[in-house]
């Protein structure tokens, strides 16, 4: 199949987009969340127009950084290939997501602050987050059979909402770094509680217990 002109342009533009994203991350690490697009262009070693041409706005760059974080969560979860059923995997996914956010708290707090505000065009953070939680749920083993079909349709979005809520308090400084994972786990267990297989709960599965 012949490669289209737009495909070739996209392939050529990807290294430039990456340079801009990485430059933005470097500025954020220096606690320069209010950097200008001119400062960003200088840091990336590109023309002033390039960040606009590649992304359109600063908000879009922040969304791109956020997307990279979710991609990292996804890759690490897949690599871990955790055993157990859906609730077990969900807690591993929560821990994975929290650990990614805590690796660069200064950068990620700044990004969360940006993507939580209105932007010229809607982002894809919700869709990406839903996809990550869907990955952990898989076929829903360990969920109540009668509720499983509906749960698989609704849980990914509810977990996306819940995790974003926990992150919002962390971003605002109301949750310490050391508390992020524990509160995120509590959120996930509360959401799952109503749809977990009753037999599983009666067996005292570790996923329903507090982490040590």
Predicted regions and their residues:
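Alpha-helical DNA-contacting segments of helix-turn-helix folds
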Residues: 28, 61-69, 111, 115, ...
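Short hydrophobic clusters on alpha-helical segments that form packing/core surfaces
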Residues: 20-28, 73, 97, 163
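Amphipathic alpha-helical segments that line or abut small-molecule/effector binding pockets
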Residues: 22, 67, 87-102, 153, ...
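C-terminal peripheral helix-coil segments that are non-catalytic and often amphipathic
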Residues: 1-4, 135-142, 168, 172-212
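Basic, helix-initiating cap at the start of DNA-binding domains
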Residues: 1-43, 60-63
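Hydrophobic alpha-helical connector segments
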Residues: 64, 78-106, 117, 128
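Short hydrophobic/aromatic patch on the recognition helix
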Residues: 45-55
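Amphipathic alpha-helical packing segments from all-alpha helical-bundle domains
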Residues: 118-145, 149-164, 182-192
